C-alpha cells in the first residue's frame, strides 16, 4: 500500500478531525457572548451546547454503515457540507432555538469523521504503521481543542463570534472540497481486491 497519495489523504482527514474538536469545545469559549446575544441562562446555554453532543452520539452507528456503503470520500464530504451549513446558520442565528438547531446540524456533520478516517487509514497504511498513524490523528485532533480555547478567544474578541463562525463555515466548505479532491477509499493497487491484513484490521475494529 505504497502511494504518494496517502500522506495528503491523511492530513486532510486529520484536519477534519481537528475541526471536530474545535466545534466540540468552542461554545464554552464564546459562552459570555452567546448569553448576551440570546439573553439566556447558563442552563439554556448547556442545552445549546448539548445539541452537538446528542446528534454526534446518535449518528455513530449510522455513519459506520454509511462509510461501508458510500465510502469515506462521499461520507465525509457530505457530512462536512452539513457541518459547514450548521456553522454558517449558527453565525447568523437570530434566536436561541435557531442557534440550537444549528449546533445539532454541526454535531451531525462532524460525526462521520473519526469512524470513516480510521477505516480508510487502515487500508492505506500497513499494520506496523497503523498504531502510529492513529495516534498522530488523535494528536492533531488535540490541536483543535487548543485552537478552540485561547486562540479562539482572541479571534472572537477581535472580530466577534458571528464573524468567527462565518469563517469556520467557509473553511469547512473548503475542507469539503479538499476531501472530495484528495481522499480515496482504497489505494489504487488494491482497487480490485483488499489486502488480507487490511480486512483483518477492519474486522477487529481497526486494531493492527
Whereabouts are the PLM-identified features?
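Extracytoplasmic
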Residues: 8-42, 63
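Small-residue-rich segments within alpha-helical transmembrane domains of MFS-like 12-TM solute carriers
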Residues: 21, 25, 107-115, 146
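Residue-level signature of mid-helix packing/kink "hotspots" within the transmembrane helices
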Residues: 25, 53-61, 145-146
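Conserved MFS/SLC helix-loop-helix module at the cytosolic interface between two early adjacent transmembrane helices
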Residues: 58-97
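Cytoplasmic helix-loop-helix junction between adjacent transmembrane helices
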Residues: 102-141
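Helix-loop-helix hairpin linking two adjacent transmembrane segments in secondary transporters
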Residues: 137-185
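Flexible cytoplasmic inter-helical loops of multi-pass small-molecule transporters
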Residues: 181-207
Amino acid at each position: 500500500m505504497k502511494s504518494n497519495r496517502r500522506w495528503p489523504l491523511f492530513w486532510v482527514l486529520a484536519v477534519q478531525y481537528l475541526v471536530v474538536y474545535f466545534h466540540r469545545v468552542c461554545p464554552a469559549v464564546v459562552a459570555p457572548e452567546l448569553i448576551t446575544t440570546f439573553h439566556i441562562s447558563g442552563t439554556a446555554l448547556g442545552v445549546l451546547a448539548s445539541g452537538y453532543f446528542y446528534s454526534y452520539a446518535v449518528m455513530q452507528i449510522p455513519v459506520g454503515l454509511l462509510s461501508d456503503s458510500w465510502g469515506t470520500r462521499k461520507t465525509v464530504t457530505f457530512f462536512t457540507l452539513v457541518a459547514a451549513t450548521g456553522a454558517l446558520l449558527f453565525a447568523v442565528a437570530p434566536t436561541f432555538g435557531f442557534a440550537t438547531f444549528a449546533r445539532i446540524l454541526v454535531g451531525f456533520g462532524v460525526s462521520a469523521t473519526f469512524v470513516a478516517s480510521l477505516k480508510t487509514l487502515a487500508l492505506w497504511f500497513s499494520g506496523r504503521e497503523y498504531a502510529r498513524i492513529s495516534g498522530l490523528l488523535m494528536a492533531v485532533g488535540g490541536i483543535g481543542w487548543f485552537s478552540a480555547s485561547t486562540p479562539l478567544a482572541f479571534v472572537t474578541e477581535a472580530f466577534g463570534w458571528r464573524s468567527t463562525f462565518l469563517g469556520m463555515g467557509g473553511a469547512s466548505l473548503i475542507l469539503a472540497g479538499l476531501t472530495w479532491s484528495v481522499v480515496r477509499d482504497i489505494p489504487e493497487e488494491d482497487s480490485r481486491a483488499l489486502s488480507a491484513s487490511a480486512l483483518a484490521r477492519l474486522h477487529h475494529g481497526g486494531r493492527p
